[in-house]
Each structure stands twice: as structure tokens, then as C-alpha cells.
């Protein structure tokens, strides 16, 4: 499968929300149902308007996306149906061309993502007991050396 990376388009907001939903359901089983619903509401409002980088197939079908703010990767979500095919790696490598000192945060309980970032060469620089919304889901702070 050929993958290209491009900017997101407003009209594909629903597809990107669906990728977020399926990715979270596949990797974030530690979230409470109530908090998962709260996050989905926030994401549903935010994603269609966000300046995302999207990984698309040669049919221009989104299969993953990343949000980059300056040198910080705020989000990386891959459709679970295509995980393990290097799409996350491609998006991170794209981010590194734009922000060589890339940082990100990852839920400590998301062991698949923690392993992915460590394999990519990221180093842990710190830890927070709470997530960005102050909930008790610890975050690891990572940087690409």
C-alpha cells in the first residue's frame, strides 16, 4: 500500500474522528467509559478544524493522522486495521523533518505507544501524574534526541 502525507481537509473530519475512536478503543482500554466519552466530545469538536497531517492511501483515503504544534507532536493516531505497516513511523519521520527536536507526551498505560516511541529512538525526559485535562492517567514526556 502506497502512503502519502498531506494536510487534512475540513470535509474529512468524520473520517478522522472515526480513526481516533477506533484507535483509542484498540489501545486505551485503561480509560474509564465516562472519560472516554468526554474526550470524544472534545475531539469531535476539535479535529475537523485542526491543522493535521494525514497519512492517506493512493486512493486518498485517510488511515492515520498527526497534530504538530511547533516542535511538539500533540497527537498520533493510526487506524487499527493498518497498524504495523509503518504508517506511524512515516508520520513521525515527517514530523522530524519539520521539528528535529520533536517532543511528545504518551499515556504511560498505553504500552504499545510507549514501545513504539522508544523503538523510534525517543527518550523519556519526565513524567506527570495526570494527563493534560488533570485526570489520573500518567503521561511520559518524550523527546527525540
Swiss-Prot record:
Gene3D superfamilies: 3.40.630.30. Belongs to the acetyltransferase family. InterPro entries: Acyl_CoA_acyltransferase, GNAT_dom. GO terms for molecular function: protein-lysine-acetyltransferase activity. Pfam families: Acetyltransf_10 (PF13673). Disulfide bonds: none annotated. It comes from Salmonella typhimurium (strain LT2 / SGSC1412 / ATCC 700720). Its EC number is 2.3.1.-. This is Peptidyl-lysine N-acetyltransferase YjaB. PROSITE patterns: GNAT.
Amino acid at each position: 500500500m502506497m502512503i502519502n502525507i498531506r494536510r487534512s481537509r475540513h470535509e474529512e473530519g468524520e473520517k478522522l474522528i472515526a480513526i481516533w475512536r477506533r484507535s483509542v478503543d484498540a489501545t486505551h482500554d485503561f480509560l474509564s467509559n465516562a472519560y472516554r466519552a468526554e474526550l470524544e466530545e472534545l475531539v469531535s469538536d476539535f479535529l475537523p478544524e485542526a491543522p493535521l497531517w494525514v497519512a492517506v492511501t493512493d486512493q486518498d483515503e485517510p488511515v492515520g493522522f498527526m497534530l504538530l504544534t511547533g516542535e511538539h507532536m500533540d497527537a498520533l493516531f493510526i487506524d487499527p486495521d493498518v497498524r504495523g505497516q509503518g504508517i506511524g513511523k512515516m508520520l513521525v519521520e515527517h514530523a522530524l523533518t519539520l521539528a528535529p527536536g520533536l517532543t511528545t507526551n504518551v499515556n504511560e498505560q498505553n504500552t504499545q505507544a510507549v514501545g513504539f516511541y522508544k523503538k523510534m529512538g525517543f527518550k523519556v525526559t519526565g513524567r506527570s501524574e495526570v494527563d493534560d485535562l488533570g485526570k489520573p492517567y500518567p503521561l511520559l514526556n518524550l523527546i527525540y534526541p
